[in-house]
């Protein structure tokens, strides 16, 4: 079972999952130059320990199994890529790792080259084999006889780049089938090709593993690739230090040194790393601390130096009372929402009413109306952010162009909580269903704020004709379901956390069969619009399409959004260089700048 996610599922492109659209327009993504590296002569501090509510358990974050924030943090310490986001947020090119360029505008053709001397932590060159594996997995090239992706990528894009690439040395060149709007965010190297192949075929040498992988991709030899795909999908999960070092090969500044289940992961400097900014600590330990109060105490005691967590009013007060620490509080590029499952035979599935879609729709609408969003904001979020407001759109953040129009599609839900409960009761009466209606509701066990949200929701929903059943558990098992498997819960609450400012990508959870579609949502019009969005370069056209998608979500009572995620980071004042980021990986984004305070 996947031990997953104290707070949020990752959202993004390239090696991660879906995109949280609407954070910024494409033209804001202006690449800047690589950061200045710390001098080789700098004296390294021995260790910095940071807290997080979970630690790594899967080392392939490109896979559906590995797509969560905790895994992405270790990946960020131990990986390199062609670009990343700073905290502006602006896209920064890492030209010390490699380069990329548009070779042709029509058809859109791009080329990526890894620089000479860039190697995996075992000394093996990063080259065309790694690029070939990345291409095959990201673009969903290979499927089995049932049409299922052989490589279970978290966000496969099989409708944008289907033609085989050209590979030469450490360069890959490939053509897009369409003018893909997010091409600059779509490609990045994941796990080592020779590692995946050697785990599947242990008798192969590194050279043979690489050449066989390239040949099999180029010749579409799915029979040989099947074993590699199994490893890629399942072979990178481990809750303790993996016995096989191929599992955690690094291309970044750090490499895993030790992993202890539900306790900590320690990462030591990669002595071969020379292609990017240099960290100032020899080791980074990520310590699992699920309770924010305990993390505050740990900073106060000097046990850890940096922490972040889901704040409550009490947590913020404790952080503000710390005598030896600084803190930063701001909204993050993540949002809380409640999703409804429409294909599991539960109360929101038309099948429960003899296939009567209209009845199921009214029940969904009634439930969404019963969510006391205003009370949740007033009691749980405004103590952290006095300016906090209900977020009413799936695709647009508050204040963004298009948000007000998107909000208008949900006009029936914009009343007071009391007014909405009256509407909910009326809808259930119109539907002619027997009440109370059982709703099996999941939230992550141990998450204080989510528990508080559930209690407020249960009081409200039960008062209008529902019966919320607590199905909280810590393991997020429902995220392992991929259609046609069914989510056993009728409703779930969690947050999507964005890693990029991409325009496209919402098809991962809005298209049936998408790796993060755990609701069974299936809307042909929305699917067609999502395909259009992939190639919409004009910002005005992007806006039109996204508003049309939002209208479909509102019409179908897809889900209900609650609030923009409040973020809180605190750190010992003996550490400098801490700078929170609204995107994942949050405050880790510039770990190379963390340093002991001078003097």
Q: Residue ranges of each PLM-predicted region?
A:
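Alpha-helical secondary-structure segments
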Residues: 49, 126-136, 169, 173, ...
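Ligand-site clamp/hinge motif
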Residues: 242-245, 272-318
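Extracytoplasmic/peripheral linker and loop segments enriched in polar/acidic and small residues
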Residues: 41, 363-365, 369, 373, ...
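N-terminal lobe/hinge region of extracytoplasmic solute-binding protein
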Residues: 48-105, 249
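Structural transition elements
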Residues: 384-427, 446-450
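Surface-exposed binding/hinge segments that line
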Residues: 150-231
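Aromatic- and charge-enriched surface segment that lines or borders ligand/interaction sites
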Residues: 100-147, 166-175, 182, 295-298, ...
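Periplasmic binding protein-like
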Residues: 50, 123, 300, 304-306, ...
């Amino acid at each position: 079972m996947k031990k997953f996610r104290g707070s949020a599922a990752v959202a993004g492109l390239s090696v991660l999952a879906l995109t949280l659209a609407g954070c910024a327009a494409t033209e804001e993504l202006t690449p800047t130059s690589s950061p200045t590296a710390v001098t080789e002569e700098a004296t390294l501090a021995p260790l910095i320990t940071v807290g997080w509510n979970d630690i790594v358990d899967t080392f392939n974050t490109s896979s559906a199994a590995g797509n969560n924030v905790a895994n992405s943090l270790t990946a960020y310490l131990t990986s390199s890529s062609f670009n990343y986001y700073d905290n502006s947020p602006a896209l920064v090119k890492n030209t010390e790792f490699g380069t990329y360029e548009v070779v042709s505008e029509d058809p859109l053709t791009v080329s990526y080259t890894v620089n000479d001397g860039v190697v995996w932590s075992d000394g093996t060159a990063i080259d065309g084999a790694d690029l070939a594996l990345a291409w095959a997995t990201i673009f969903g090239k290979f499927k089995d006889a049932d049409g299922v992706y052989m490589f279970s990528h978290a966000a496969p894009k099989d409708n944008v780049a289907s033609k085989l690439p050209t590979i030469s040395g450490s360069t890959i060149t490939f053509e897009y089938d369409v003018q893909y709007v997010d091409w600059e965010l779509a490609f990045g190297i994941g796990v080592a090709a020779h590692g995946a192949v050697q785990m599947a075929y242990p008798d192969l040498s590194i050279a043979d593993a690489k050449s066989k992988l390239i040949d099999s991709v180029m010749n579409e030899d799915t029979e040989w690739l099947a074993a590699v795909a199994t490893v890629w999908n399942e072979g990178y999960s481990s809750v303790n230090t993996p016995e096989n070092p191929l599992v955690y090969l690094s291309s970044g500044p750090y490499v895993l040194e030790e992993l202890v289940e539900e306790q900590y992961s320690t990462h030591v400097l990669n002595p071969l790393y020379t292609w990017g900014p240099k960290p100032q600590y020899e080791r980074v330990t990520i310590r699992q601390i699920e309770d924010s109060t305990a993390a505050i105490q740990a900073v106060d005691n000097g046990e850890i130096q940096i922490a972040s967590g889901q704040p409550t009013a009490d947590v913020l007060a404790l952080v503000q009372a710390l005598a030896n620490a600084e803190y930063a509080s701001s909204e993050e590029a993540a949002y809380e929402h409640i999703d409804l499952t429409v294909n599991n035979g539960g109360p929101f599935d038309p099948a429960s009413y003899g296939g009567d879609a209209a009845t199921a729709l009214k029940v969904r609408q009634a439930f969404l109306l019963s969510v006391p969003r205003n009370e949740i904001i007033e009691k749980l979020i405004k103590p952290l952010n006095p300016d906090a407001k209900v977020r009413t759109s799936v695709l647009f953040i508050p204040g963004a162009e298009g948000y007000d129009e998107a909000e208008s599609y949900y006009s029936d839900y914009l009343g007071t909580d009391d007014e909405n409960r009256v509407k909910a009761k009326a809808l259930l009466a119109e539907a002619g269903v027997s009440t109370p209606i059982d709703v099996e509701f999941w939230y992550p066990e141990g998450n204080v704020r989510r528990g508080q949200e559930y209690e407020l929701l249960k009081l409200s929903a039960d008062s209008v004709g529902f019966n919320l059943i607590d199905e909280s558990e810590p393991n997020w098992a429902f995220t392992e379901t991929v259609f046609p498997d069914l989510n056993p819960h009728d409703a779930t609450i969690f947050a999507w956390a964005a890693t990029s400012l991409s325009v496209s990508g919402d098809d991962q959870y809005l298209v049936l069969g998408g790796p993060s579609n755990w609701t069974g949502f299936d809307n042909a019009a929305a699917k067609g619009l999502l395909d259009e969005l992939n190639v919409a370069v004009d910002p005005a056209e992007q806006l039109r399409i996204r508003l049309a998608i939002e209208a479909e979500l509102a019409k179908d009572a897809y889900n209900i959004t609650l609030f923009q995620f409040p973020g809180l980071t605190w750190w010992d004042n003996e550490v400098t260089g801490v700078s929170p980021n609204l995107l994942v990986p949050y405050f880790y984004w510039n770990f190379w700048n963390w340093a002991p305070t001078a003097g």
